[in-house]
Swiss-Prot record:
Name of the molecule in the record: Retinitis pigmentosa 9 protein homolog
Site of covalent link Glycyl lysine isopeptide (Lys-Gly) (interchain with G-Cter in SUMO2): 121
Transmembrane segments: none
GO MF annotations, alphabetized: zinc ion binding
Gene: rp9
UniProt-annotated stretches for the region PIM1-binding: 1-147
Phosphoserine: residues bearing it: 204, 206
Region annotated Disordered, chain positions: 1-61, 154-213
Location in or out of the cell: Nucleus
Stated role: Is thought to be a target protein for the PIM1 kinase. May play some roles in B-cell proliferation in association with PIM1.
Basic residues composition bias: residue spans: 176-204
Superkingdom, natural source: Eukaryota
Zinc finger (CCHC-type) boundaries: 96-114
Subunit note: Binds to PIM1. Binds to ZNHIT4.
Length: 213
């Protein structure tokens, strides 16, 4: 009895047992979901029954399979087909244009600045029609231009008003100067007349004194 009682596993507390059962349930549920996802992925990736696979175009097929082109065909067969994804969702293609010498597009692509094929007006209309920000940018530029014109007009009006004020003030100063000059001249004349009268009076007195003697 003692050996049988000693070999028994001690009972776990009810809380630990509940936690263990929940963990087992969660693992079973995760395993079932994983199996379902694998099934869906394999089902949708497999071609339908009776599907005849056509010949796929391979990247190395653009180079003729002739002696001497083995290295180039091998390079194209294992070349990366996806671009390098940069931050903000911008894709950089590993290719160079021989016209503009920029990376990211090939010769003849519409992204090239030297692309001049087709009608330029139609291309501009296409860009304006496809780009949702084109109208907003154009309106912003027009608004900035109008604001700039208004600012320049205001500056011009302020400068003309300042010129008018300065001209009026300068004309007023000139008139004041003229009046001062006239007053000064008048005072000088009066002083000169007084001096002349005094001289005449002195001369007459001196003549009278000489006559009396």
């Amino acid at each position: 009895m003692s050996s049988g009682a000693g070999s028994r596993r001690p009972r776990e507390p009810p809380e630990h047992e509940l936690q263990r059962r929940r963990e087992q349930k969660r693992r079973r549920h995760d395993a079932q979901q994983l199996q379902q996802l694998k099934h869906l992925e394999s089902f949708y990736e497999k071609p339908p029954p009776g599907f005849i696979k056509e010949d796929e175009t391979k990247p190395e097929d653009c180079i003729p399979d002739v002696p001497g082109n083995e290295h180039a065909r091998e390079f194209l067969a294992h070349a990366p087909t996806k671009g390098l994804w940069m931050p903000l969702g911008r894709e950089v293609k590993v290719m160079q244009c021989w016209r503009c010498k920029r990376y990211g597009h090939r010769t003849g692509d519409k992204e090239c600045p030297f692309f001049i094929k087709g009608n330029q007006k139609l291309e501009q209309f296409r860009v304006a029609h496809e780009d949702p920000m084109y109208d907003i940018i154009r309106e912003n530029k027009r608004h900035e231009k109008d604001v700039r014109i208004q600012q320049l007009k205001q500056l011009l009006e302020d400068s003309t008003s300042d010129d008018d004020g300065s001209s009026s003030s300068s004309s007023g100063d000139r008139e004041k100067r003229k009046k001062r000059k006239k007053k000064e001249k008048h005072k000088k004349r009066k002083k000169e007349k007084k001096k002349k009268k005094k001289r005449k009076h002195k001369a007459s007195k001196s003549s009278e004194s000489s006559d009396s003697e």
